Amino acid sequence: MDKKKLSHSSLQSSVTSVLAALLCILIGLIVGFLVLLAINPAHAWGDGFVRILKGGFHDAPYGVGKELANAAPLVMTGLSVAFAFKTGLFNIGAAGQYTLGAYGALYCAIMLKMPWFVCLLAATLLGGIWGAIPGFFKAYFNINEVITSIMFNWIGLYLVNELVYQNGTGPMYDVRNTRTLNLSKNPAFAQSIIPDFGLNKMFQTNSTTIAIFLAAAVAILIWVVLNKTTFGYELKAVGLNKSAARYAGINEKKNIILSMAIAGALAGFGAGLYFLSNVSQWNPLNSTSLPAMGFNGISVALLASSNPIGTIFSALFISHISVGGSFLSTKYYPTEISDLISGIIIYLCAFSMLFRGKIHGLLFKNADKTNVNAEPAPAKTETEMEGK
């Protein structure tokens, strides 16, 4: 009976979380449309709102392929933030971990000419190491992981830029394009590019690979680890109450470091998916801004309520409206309008707890009441009482 009640409660929680996220999206889109009206009323509907809603389908199949290529790293950075949050930590250092992952993947591809899966492993390893450092400071010195991870974002950016650029003489650096060497333009790097299995032809792009399927598989794996394994239970127990976890014999210091290391590894893996799909090349001259994928991962995790499976769908949605925004005519609207709508939706996600409470009250108010018609538990007999 207890298991049945627990399962029913979990189902209610999942339903309310999904509906709350959909409500956030709906309100965000409405507010976004009002902004479009305020900027340019004449083109707010057809050339603005509808084009954003169509996303990549406005220029299918190319646009859809672009959505999938951008969604893969978003799933991973969203997982990075969500995993840490599930274990009681806030990983705002996904951008730095993503940066180190990008370097690991590109170094293995360009300098060592390794197969793509080895390059992905290097990206995962470097991201994990970079994530473990704030975890170490949190575990042994109780230094807030938000502060240390922000600092390591910038340290990672400048370190990677210097390693790639080397005053313009770096072996990974293409002086003419001011970026790392393009993997697709050199046959020597062919084995380092993630295979597409015909997806590039299907979507008429050069960057649509199996990356999105790899990201989805990792998301499912993380859900299984968190919900179906003893290791996942220990991680969540430490996040909920370190003192209680310690009393239960769980090594909270080890688990804090592991949580941040895994979160960093996920972000690094996402960078590998992005750069080994040849979506873009690394620009070491960009020293003023961190990779947007890292911070967009926070948006993905918030919209998904930190559910690993939910990050797949929230990443696809964020990618969808971002690509839709890129198709807006600059005569009428700035391309950043899609980022504005995303920001509004994520801002509303801060109220998702309120929305979930209201939705739960509307849908399940009768289900939560005690069933007065249920048979009461049988009373103990005098013999049973005396036996005690």
What feature does the model see in each segment?
Residues M1-I25, A38, L240, Y247, ...:
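Cytosolic-side transmembrane-helix boundaries in multi-pass membrane proteins
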Residues D2-M76:
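Membrane-interfacial amphipathic/re-entrant helices at transmembrane-helix boundaries
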Residues A20-L37, L74-V81, A102, L106-C108, ...:
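Hydrophobic core segments of alpha-helical transmembrane domains in multi-pass membrane transport
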Residues F83-G104, L226, F231-E234, S329-P334, ...:
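Cytoplasmic juxtamembrane regions at transmembrane-helix boundaries
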Residues L266-G268, L273-G343:
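Transmembrane alpha-helical segments in multi-pass inner-membrane proteins
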